[in-house]
A protein has these predicted regions:
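Histidine-anchored nucleotide/phosphate-binding helix
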Residues: 1-12
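Glycine- and acidic
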Residues: 15-21, 170-178, 236-242, 261-265
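Alpha-helical scaffold elements adjacent to nucleotide-binding pockets in ATP/GTP-utilizing enzyme cores
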Residues: 34-38, 62-65, 189
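Anion (oxyanion) recognition and catalysis
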Residues: 9, 40, 67
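Active-site cores that bind ATP or allylic diphosphates and position pyrophosphate for catalysis
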Residues: 21-23, 51, 65-222, 230, ...
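Long, charged, mostly alpha-helical binding arms that flank functional sites
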Residues: 202-279
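Basic, alpha-helical terminal appendages of large translation-related enzymes
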Residues: 14-18, 25, 29, 33-34, ...
């Protein structure tokens, strides 16, 4: 979003979307399609879309140039030894191979021969630079077993991100590359490739990645949760992905507003989710239609008595929103038989005057003994002052309307720790239960809502419709609770 803002609004420039598809073992067409779809959902329209694989020939030539100039070499050191040597600043035993030998092995890598598969190509930058990103990074490696989703089996070896990024950025005409601060150590490496290959300069602008408490953004760790079935997928409402927060109920206008307000700061901080969801509440509160839901568990039957009690069920049109008449009206049914939540019934005292929301006041005349409470009786007092009562309760008529089954879902953070360190064992910090569901009954007006609609259940909160009443065989509405910035 920041790239889109700076490209199109701040500087009247062009936004380029490039998909880095240099590892056929990890890249799939469905992933690239999901990225493009997510950007479209956020209203981001790149002026150009390209793939690193569009430039495989150019990258191959760049690697040849580095080898021929003595700035790259082939290395068959095993992964663990190479990692250890780089960490300790020790030169590889293959570092001084001749140019001719390196070119020969590069050809073997290209055809995927037995010898070629044992080797990689490393840039010959430094052995012991304090910045470990400069310690002879790998720039080409073999992968003959996985077909590339765009180039098939044409290539047996592929460039790494470290080589591909500066070469392709320069060639494609990128003027400003916005990179998160996790890549800051790689900036000198990026510049080394630009200078050594005599490429057009690219200006790098670092900004801090947006981090949140009790959340981790590592794709590798998130993939573990997906693969293990700990979450429902990449669009799970607990996931810190665009699709995840949208499924939780974040609106695109609120998301854009929040991100642009943060700006391209270099300060690395872990933010509380509160301000994120509070921004969303400002967006949805003025337009979310109000409805009622009563929990099915231990539901309490309420008998209405008194001269003002209706003889037969009747309905009235009431505003869907108390401050926004443009949203329309809903049908509210009144009768002698109501249902209320167990928690409300337990709070009542004999003789207490309460307010039955959208109807009026009533006196509690009887409360059935027992736990849970099964029934109560109330006498209407519609002349009573609703401002004088302590308790305002929601309710539904059990007569004169069809009550709609609903699932009310709520979600917790994935981890118990505010910030997960790199060395932390993920399993030890996973929240045991992160999704809870309660069955409820809603007023019949909710049957009109479809997936992604947002409503408010009075005294409960805001909910996004994950499945509409008619969207499936079960004839129920599935609702996901939307955080508001208070609590989780």
């Amino acid at each position: 979003m920041l790239s889109d803002y700076f490209a199109h609004q701040a500087y009247n420039g062009k936004l380029r979307l490039r998909l880095d598809d240099t590892n056929p073992s990890k890249e799939k067409e469905e992933f690239q399609d999901a990225i493009i779809e997510d950007l479209a959902l956020m209203g981001i329209k790149p002026d150009f879309v390209s793939f690193t694989s569009d430039h495989f020939d150019r990258l191959y030539d760049a690697c040849l140039t580095l080898i021929k100039s003595g700035n790259a070499y082939s290395d068959d050191t095993d992964v663990e030894t190479m990692r250890d040597e780089r960490g300790r600043g020790i030169a590889s035993k293959r570092r001084e191979r001749t140019v001719e030998e390196n070119l020969r092995i590069f050809d073997e890598m290209k055809v995927g021969s037995e010898e070629g598969l044992k080797n990689c190509i490393r840039a010959k930058i430094s052995v012991d630079n304090p910045n470990k990103a400069m310690r002879d990074p790998v720039i080409y490696r073999c992968n003959p077993n996985d077909a590339h989703h765009r180039t098939g089996t044409q290539w047996k070896m592929y460039p790494t991100y470290d080589l591909a990024c500066p070469v392709v950025d320069s060639f494609e005409g990128v003027t400003h590359a916005l990179r998160s601060t996790e890549y800051t150590d790689r900036n000198p490496q990026f510049q080394w490739f630009i200078d050594t290959l005599k490429l057009r300069q690219v200006y790098m602008w670092d900004f801090a990645r947006m981090n949140f408490i009790r959340t981790f953004l590592s794709k590798r760790k998130l993939a573990k949760l997906v693969d293990a079935g700990r979450v429902w997928g990449w669009d799970d409402p607990r996931m810190p992905t665009i699709r995840g927060v949208r499924r939780r109920g974040m609106t695109i206008p609120a998301l854009r507003d929040f991100i642009l307000k943060q700006g391209p700061s270099r300060n690395v901080v872990s933010m509380d989710w509160g301000s994120f969801w509070a921004t969303n509440k400002k967006e949805i509160d003025p337009i979310a239609p109000r409805h009622t839901a009563i929990l099915k568990k231990d539901v309490v039957k309420v008998a209405i008595m008194g001269e003002e009690a209706p003889e037969e069920p009747r309905s009235e049109e009431k505003p869907l929103h108390p401050k926004n008449s443009a949203i329309g009206t809903k049908k509210v049914t009144f009768s002698k038989e109501l249902i209320m939540d167990q928690a409300d019934a337990k709070s009542f005292k004999y003789g207490e005057e309460i307010t039955i929301m959208q109807w009026g006041n009533a006196f509690v005349r009887s409360i059935a003994s027992g736990d849970p409470i099964t029934s109560i009786t109330c006498e209407l007092n519609l002349k009573g002052d609703v401002r004088a009562t302590e308790k305002k309760v929601t309710w539904l008529s059990s007569e004169g309307q069809k009550l709609i089954p609903a699932e009310l879902w709520d979600f917790d953070y994935l981890i118990t720790k505010d910030k997960l360190e790199e060395e932390d064992d993920l399993e030890k910090f996973l929240t045991p239960v992160t999704a809870t569901m309660e069955e409820a009954l809603c007023d019949e007006n909710v049957t009109k809502y479809k997936k992604d609609d947002i409503i408010q259940l009075e005294r409960r909160g805001y909910y996004r419709v994950d499945k509409g009443y008619d969207e499936g065989d079960e004839k129920k509405i599935v609702l996901f609770c939307i955080p508001t910035g208070k609590g989780k």
